[in-house]
Amino acid sequence: MLRSWEFVLLISCFLCFSSDALQRISLKKMPSIRETLQEMGMKVADVLPSLKHRISYLDEGLHNKTASTILTNFRDTQYYGEISIGTPAQIFKVVFDTGSSNLWVPSRQCSPLYSACVSHNRYDSSESSTYKPKGTKITLTYAQGYIKGFFSQDIVRVADIPIIQFFTEAIALPSIPFIFARFDGVLGMGYPKQAIGGVIPVFDNIMSEKVLSENVFSVYYSRHSESNTGGEIILGGSDPSHYTGDFHYVSTSREGYWHVDLKGVSIENKIVLCHDGCTATIDTGTSFISGPASSISVLMETIGATLSDGDYVIDCKKINLLPDITFHLGDMTYSLSSSTYVLKFSDETECTVAFMAVDIPPPLGPLWLLGATFIKQYYIEFDRQNNRIGFATSF
């Protein structure tokens, strides 16, 4: 039960904006973990040797207290937004992740022995007048370590929308890879089915407050690499100034997940993969595009890329000669040019191809993950109201 003054606080906050207004979250662009390692003269495989050939998902174990969480690019994203937790507000940089459904941030109770904790903003429950303990322990297990913590309840503000939210205070963070991360925590934008511990996800709590004109959110990533203004997430709709033409919608293919049918992957108008269909998810929590190891191997061989220290690379002089790679989603095709899917770091002569092999076992996989490399080219609308994803060409 809310105390009376907490209720008044929430009501007064809700009166600050119209229920049909778009609620905006500014995204900032940061170096990804991969880019941070590059700046330090290190490669991913130097830090995480198991990535040298491919990454394999752990078997899912979605039960109440412990679950295996997909590693992919170890939340190797470049985009974060700010939220606040508590009263007065404590500010956190979080990744808005469509591949998960829980909110976690480092806790003040995290031991100084975990250097990844002390290098980030930490939630201090003793400084919040609206904090309520829950205490249920939770472990999120990664391929290279784990996050341990416990559930707490407090007022979380996202785009100035206040909600009462259960979240995880992380008290154990592995140094690898999180010490290299520029974000503090993760805010899952997935369905309740993915939520560990049976908590209600943040976006579901926002929807229940009836403050949005539509139960959708849209994601825009800026293409302008020279700016640290990374883009925007809009709750309740989309912004026509971010895209051209119309949205084309694809229904989700699996209940409770942002999965869609991928009808093919083609090069030069010839389908080379997924002839009989595959499954893909639009993953805002990762930078690269990933797929089954056997498929990625064929794709990279087709464009002439080779595997080196865990990454697919190609001679930088050949970038302009490479073909478009096209994804068939619904009745539309979505192409990526070589300047989009090939990355050049500093003055290196070998450039990194933004594809990687990730084998996800059944029942969740096999699965393609279309990360920031894809999202930068297409404005994406995630529609919970109709269980579909919309795609439009972004500016």
From Swiss-Prot:
Residues 79-392 form the Peptidase A1 domain. N-glycosylated. It catalyses: Cleavage of Leu-|-Xaa bond in angiotensinogen to generate angiotensin I. Inhibited completely by aspartyl protease inhibitor pepstatin A, but not by the serine- or metalloproteinase inhibitors PMSF or EDTA. InterPro entries: Aspartic_peptidase_A1 (IPR001461), Aspartic_peptidase_AS (IPR001969), Aspartic_peptidase_N (IPR012848), PEPTIDASE_A1 (IPR033121), Peptidase_aspartic_dom_sf (IPR021109). The keyword NAD does not apply. Expressed by the venom gland (at protein level). Belongs to the peptidase A1 family. This is Renin. It comes from Echis ocellatus (Ocellated saw-scaled viper). The gene is Asp-Eoc51.
